[in-house]
């Protein structure tokens, strides 16, 4: 199923601001980016996009309350600086199984002042 269609199903009888957890694992990202997620998900605390085909995350909306972000098993190789701006309260980040090859890419995560755990297994 495509990512934006899964989000539509998750919203059944709810508004985006009612959603605290959103699991989009194995949904297909047609253009390699996050699709269907907007800054209306202002209460979102947990987002999982495991194995969805992401290549970049620059279009991630502002998610001030997001604490845990699962991005494993995608094709992300950069763009991580956007996380400090869009997800300032992020505590747990899983980037395992992506295409991060350069330590300078990870250096940008220093701006995530609340980050407690970072998974980079098999990058």
Swiss-Prot record:
Domain of life: Eukaryota
Keywords in alphabetical order: Leucine-rich repeat, Repeat
UniProt cross-references to InterPro entries, sorted A to Z: AN32 (IPR045081), Leu-rich_rpt (IPR001611), Leu-rich_rpt_4 (IPR025875), LRR_dom_sf (IPR032675)
LRR repeat residues: 43-64, 65-87, 89-110, 114-123
PROSITE patterns for this protein: LRR (PS51450)
Similarity comment text for this entry: Belongs to the ANP32 family.
Name of this protein: Putative acidic leucine-rich nuclear phosphoprotein 32 family member C
């Amino acid at each position: 199923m495509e990512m934006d269609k899964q989000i539509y199903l998750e919203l059944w009888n709810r508004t985006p601001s009612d959603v605290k957890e959103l699991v989009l694992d194995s949904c297909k990202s047609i253009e390699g980016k996050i699709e269907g997620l907007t800054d209306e998900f202002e209460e979102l605390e947990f987002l999982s996009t495991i194995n969805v085909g992401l290549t970049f995350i620059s279009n991630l909306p502002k998610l001030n309350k997001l604490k845990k972000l699962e991005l494993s098993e995608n094709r992300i190789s950069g763009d991580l600086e956007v996380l400090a701006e869009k997800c300032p309260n992020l505590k747990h980040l899983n980037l395992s199984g992506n295409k991060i090859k350069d330590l300078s890419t990870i250096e940008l995560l220093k701006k995530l002042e609340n980050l407690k755990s970072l998974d980079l297994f098999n990058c």
